[in-house]
From Swiss-Prot:
Keywords: ATP-binding, Host cytoplasm, Host nucleus, Kinase, Magnesium, Metal-binding, Nucleotide-binding, Phosphoprotein, Secreted, Serine/threonine-protein kinase, Transferase, Virulence. Autophosphorylates on either Thr-3 or Thr-7. It comes from Helicobacter pylori (strain J99 / ATCC 700824) (Campylobacter pylori J99). It comes from the Bacteria. The lineage of its organism: Bacteria, Pseudomonadati, Campylobacterota, Epsilonproteobacteria, Campylobacterales. InterPro entries: HipA-like_C. This is Serine/threonine-protein kinase CtkA. Induction: Is strongly expressed in response to the interaction of H.pylori with the mammalian gastric mucosa. ATP binds at residues 21-24, 37, 72, 88-90, 179. One of its GO terms (biological process) is positive regulation of peptidyl-serine phosphorylation. The C-terminal tail (residues 301-325) is not required for the kinase activity and for translocation into human cells. It is found in: Secreted; Host cytoplasm, Host cytosol; Host nucleus. GO terms for cellular component: extracellular region; host cell cytosol; host cell nucleus. Its EC number is 2.7.11.1.
Length: 325
């Protein structure tokens, strides 16, 4: 695969970007505008550095695309002597990005601000917003959650997903999924990759214990992906799992990894292994349970005298948010 050198591309000095992990510049490549993300500068706390953030962004977005979800386009290349990821700017054609945080801030009846990631409050905001038909937005949210579960995304906060607002009509559409640099264990360098591959306890810890979702329960505790997806009765979540599961093509996913330039062989082996493990130990287990619950639901409704419990329309995380006092 030919590699791309962005060094001599025309820079757009009039656009800047937020975010904490690494520098970003705007430039033109093939007459299209891209945001180019650089790897973060070395940290004194190596275990907290995002060593492979550019690889994570590139590979994760291509995997999300393979699932049939709308996602930003990414290219991997170099800028001077650094490996960078270029993310195609989807706001260039008269669209403005409005993040979910901004929307949630308008829910003045909620006790906490738009930044807070309590799942109940997020679902409440989805149900009560007027940007997008709530059922459509809810489907998108749970599809993204299932994808983030497979990819181990620990930072899908309210500021890195949202909407595109047309500047002329003020109409809204759901923005492509973006900012996937916190997927696929970006803090794992080659030494950590080798350590995990040679120790089943280290591997399982990264499946069952962490990374966790940044979404929180009502006890302000981060949601564990395995526990949530294998225990929830949230019909919208289970429907998303049943919808996304048939699209997970591990051969395609492994091909994406194999064809990623610049990546070390041990890093590729690590990603192959971790994605196989996350699928078999989380997604497959949750999917089997989702099928069983779906069958129970159908059987219960086929018999008018059967009082079997129905699947919740929202689950234990029913939108009953804490109100402002």
């Amino acid at each position: 695969m030919p590699t791309i050198d962005f060094t001599f591309c025309e820079i757009n000095p009039k656009k800047g970007f937020g975010g904490a992990n690494g520098n970003k510049i705007s430039l033109f490549y093939n007459n299209e505008l891209y945001m180019v993300k650089f790897p973060p500068k070395p940290s004194t706390h190596k275990e907290m550095s995002y060593t492979n953030g550019c690889f994570s962004e590139y590979v994760a977005c291509h995997i999300v695309n393979s699932l049939g979800l709308k996602v930003q386009e990414t290219l991997l290349g170099t800028y001077k002597n650094k490996i960078v990821v270029a993310c195609k700017d989807f706001t260039t054609h008269q669209y403005e990005l409005v993040d979910f945080l901004s929307l949630k801030n308008t829910m003045i009846e909620l006790e906490k601000s738009g930044k807070d990631t309590n799942l109940n409050d997020v679902l409440y905001a989805i149900d009560n917003q007027h940007f997008i038909e709530p059922k459509v937005l809810k489907c998108f949210f749970w599809d993204m959650f299932v994808a983030d579960t497979l990819l181990g995304n620990f930072d899908r906060h309210n500021g890195n997903w949202g909407f595109l607002r047309a500047s002329n009509s003020k109409e809204y559409q759901i923005a492509p999924i973006f900012d996937c640099g916190s997927c696929l264990y970006p803090q794992a360098d080659d030494v950590v990759c080798q350590k995990v591959l040679s120790n089943i306890d280290e591997l399982n810890a990264r499946i069952y214990n962490f990374p966790q979702s940044i979404l929180k329960d009502d006890n302000d505790k981060k949601i564990n992906y395995y526990d949530f997806l294998t225990q929830t009765n949230n019909k919208d979540c289970l429907d998303a799992l049943l919808r996304i599961y048939p699209r997970i093509d591990m051969n395609k996913i492994h091909s994406i990894i194999d064809n990623t330039p610049f990546m070390s062989e041990i890093h590729k082996e690590f990603l192959h292994t971790m994605l196989d493990e996350r699928k078999s130990k989380i997604i497959d287990v949750a999917h089997t349970r989702a099928i069983e619950l779906s069958l129970q639901h159908k059987q219960a409704h086929s018999n008018p005298y059967d009082n079997a419990d129905d699947l919740d329309n929202s689950n234990e995380y029913t939108p009953t948010p804490k109100r402002r006092r």
